[in-house]
């Protein structure tokens, strides 16, 4: 099924892109062939249909080799083939995915090399369906075609990004057929289709059999055939926020903006969440609202299956609350008086202490404040200057 493509060594990740199937196509898999120990019988005669539909083929002259790019694969020498008693290419909507490596310099004019050849159309001279290297004309050399009888042919090299697939290198081709509608072909990339056109002349389907590798010189790693058009979505490869740290006052709002990459991502929707909505709420558009003092993380997550996320830390403050500190006054009798006060009161105490040391001000300082040891009681506390040994100030960060 389509999720097996990665395990087959097929990589449709273009630079800055990542792709996932638009849906689960496993139920549309008609036939699947892999030229390795899982897909070939121990006697090297039967090519198994791993889809479970029983479209097995009989191999003749096919060599199984280890290739540096393809791994375990089949080599066809021009006379080898795999023969089937069935038509493995279905009628109607279809996708055929082939991973191959074609030897260079093996073609000559007037020669066909078939990756797949499926029977002759009713009395027609050309096969009803074929995927072939076609060198009928000099301009066709080194090209791979997707053909239906005498209709228009879909060739890989018609796109400037594909110069030559007969270059002794690994390639993956995707041929889509939309049941007499627009047909798209891809090669090694899903960023842009290689070519697109409407087939003419209809679609032939006869009782003739199918052959893999007829007259072909080169390697085949795998073939997958579907009775639906396999399409892909571009999913995000990265995301960012316009800010990663923010500070708000209670009641204040701000807008976080998420940027999803690349620009052509199919689904750019995101999900916003707050680690504590009672402190900072966030709506579906990234608007945040500060509700009470505290710190939270606001997270944005892509909704296309890539599950990429970014976080902004938001601190909420209340400007009506002054800076706080703990004033520790050590008395000559060893007692330590602690006062949880604002910095304005600390500064007033320090000013009084300095002036009293110079001989002015009252001989005592009055605190009308809540004491740390008894936070629920308002105290009127008097500190006598001559009884003070020392004092310290501890700032509170929150």
UniProtKB/Swiss-Prot annotation:
InterPro entries: Big_2, ConA-like_dom_sf, Invasin/intimin_cell_adhesion. Pfam families: Big_2. SMART domains: BID_2. It comes from the Bacteria. Residues 240-306 form the BIG2 domain. This is Uncharacterized protein CA_C0552. The lineage of its organism: Bacteria, Bacillati, Bacillota, Clostridia, Eubacteriales.
